[in-house]
């Protein structure tokens, strides 16, 4: 997306004298969870910088050190490339009260976390995009580029030991290409459990409490 235009004149209709202009929103308040504290911080930094917005992070208290380290890394690179000092900021000692305060003070909110935090973002009085629990399945059908699909799923699922909720938790494959996809997964280092192994895993991950 390097060449994708995100600011300035996007379209111009000279016949009607109409221009579509993209402009920054301002300062983004970003709520970061403990389950994916670095990748989400980096992602939100990049999309904010790409759209010429500043961003301030409220990390999860249990993962504040790595979230802040990730934010500092992106900030240093951005400043070295010519971005203003302080374009990326963070709360050193995060709390629920401070998270609520920055959401109310910012121009927009990007909230990733549990239902309570996402609800707070939507109740902040500012435009908000909330992201809750993942547990996402992936569907591969006949139209897919099988090699790319399988490779992308493996990369996603193995990133950060698969702890990110947005990582694919299951794959649904149409019958016509099932065996082809299965071979590609195995070829790329995946392991397919047999029935006995599946039952052993099921007993560990599923119990009376879910």
Predicted regions and their residues:
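ALDH superfamily catalytic-core signature
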Residues: 43, 47-51, 69, 118-210
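Nucleotide 5′-phosphate-binding alpha/beta core
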Residues: 1
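Rossmann-like NAD(P) dinucleotide-binding subdomain of oxidoreductase/dehydrogenase enzymes
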Residues: 6-148
């Amino acid at each position: 997306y390097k060449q994708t235009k995100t600011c300035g004149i996007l379209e111009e209709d000279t016949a009607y004298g109409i221009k579509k202009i993209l402009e920054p929103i301002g300062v983004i308040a970003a709520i970061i969870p403990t389950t994916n504290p670095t990748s989400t911080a980096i992602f939100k930094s990049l999309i904010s910088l790409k759209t010429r917005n500043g961003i301030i992070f409220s990390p999860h208290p249990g993962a504040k050190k790595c979230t802040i380290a990730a934010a500092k890394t992106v900030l240093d690179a951005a400043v070295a490339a010519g971005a203003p000092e302080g374009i990326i900021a963070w709360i050193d000692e995060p709390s629920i009260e401070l998270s609520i305060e920055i959401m109310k003070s910012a121009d927009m909110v990007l909230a990733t976390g549990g239902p309570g935090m996402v609800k707070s973002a939507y109740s902040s009085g500012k435009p908000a995009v909330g992201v809750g629990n993942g547990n996402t399945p992936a569907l591969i059908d006949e139209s897919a580029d099988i090699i790319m699909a399988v490779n992308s799923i493996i990369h996603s699922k193995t990133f950060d030991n698969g702890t990110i909720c947005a990582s694919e938790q299951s794959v649904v494959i149409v019958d016509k290409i099932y065996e082809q996809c299965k071979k590609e997964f195995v070829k790329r280092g995946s392991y397919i459990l047999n029935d006995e192994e599946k039952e052993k895993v099921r007993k560990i991950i599923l119990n009376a409490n879910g």
